[in-house]
């Protein structure tokens, strides 16, 4: 299997292209500053992952920005801090401020020359439109949790994407699903029979940060630590 075997790269957005962990920690700072004990970055992210994953299972049709507001309130309760709904709703709106990784735009612009590009993201349409400005590339297809009515790792999200791609004349064998999260993406993508590329952004930190630990460690077909590394590997593949 070679990187040049594929017609389309389907990307997770948050955690892969957008640095959601930095965005979350920054946006939660007014809340965590009021917690009596000192929380590490990973303690904040792991608590967020627990509440977010549970809420996505309970209310799969709720828009992501609204779901984040509920997560904010759950975190405040867990940490014993009073928090208003105004604060919680502001946190839900913070998605627009989450930064892109420094290598994202350049790598996407390079890859766009050789592949069709698509997004499969646990987000609402309005929030993704704001993040998309930071990605600086035109995607051939965008599939959001809001449109699908469920959140990854639901198999429904991958079935939906594959059905839409089939309508674009793209076979499953021509798709390389590219993502950071083993839990949200690689486990269900592997179950769906997709080839996968792991952008292991957390290679230096270890742990799972803002994502849950997968039930099993899925096999991945390609592994890189950044989008820049993926683009470089593609250049090398072209040279043979």
Per-range role (PLM):
Residues 1-9, 37, 83, 105, ...:
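Asp-based, Mg2+/Mn2+-dependent phosphohydrolase catalytic module
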Residues 3-102, 113:
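N-terminal helical cap/lid subdomain that shapes the substrate entry/recognition surface
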């Amino acid at each position: 299997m070679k990187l040049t075997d594929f017609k389309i790269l389907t990307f997770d957005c948050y955690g892969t292209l957008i640095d959601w962990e930095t965005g979350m920690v920054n946006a939660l700072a007014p809340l965590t500053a009021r917690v009596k004990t000192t929380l590490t970055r990973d303690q904040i992210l792991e608590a967020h992952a627990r509440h977010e994953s549970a809420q996505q299972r309970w209310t799969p049709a709720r828009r992501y920005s609204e779901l984040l507001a509920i997560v904010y309130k759950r975190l405040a309760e867990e940490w014993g801090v009073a928090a208003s709904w105004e604060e919680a709703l502001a946190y839900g709106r913070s998605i627009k401020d989450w930064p892109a990784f420094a290598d994202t735009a350049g790598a996407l612009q390079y890859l766009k020359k050789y592949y069709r590009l698509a997004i499969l993201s646990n987000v609402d349409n309005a929030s993704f439109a704001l993040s998309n400005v930071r990605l600086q590339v035109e995607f051939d297809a965008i599939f959001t949790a809001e449109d699908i009515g469920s959140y990854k790792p639901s198999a429904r999200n991958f079935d939906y994407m594959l059905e839409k791609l089939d309508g674009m004349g793209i076979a499953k064998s021509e798709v390389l699903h590219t993502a950071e999260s083993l839990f949200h993406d690689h486990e269900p993508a592997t179950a769906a029979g997709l080839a996968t590329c792991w952008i292991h952004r957390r290679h230096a930190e270890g742990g799972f940060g803002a994502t849950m630990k997968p039930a099993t460690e899925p096999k991945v077909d390609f592994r890189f630590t950044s989008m820049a590394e993926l683009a470089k590997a593609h250049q090398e593949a072209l040279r043979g």
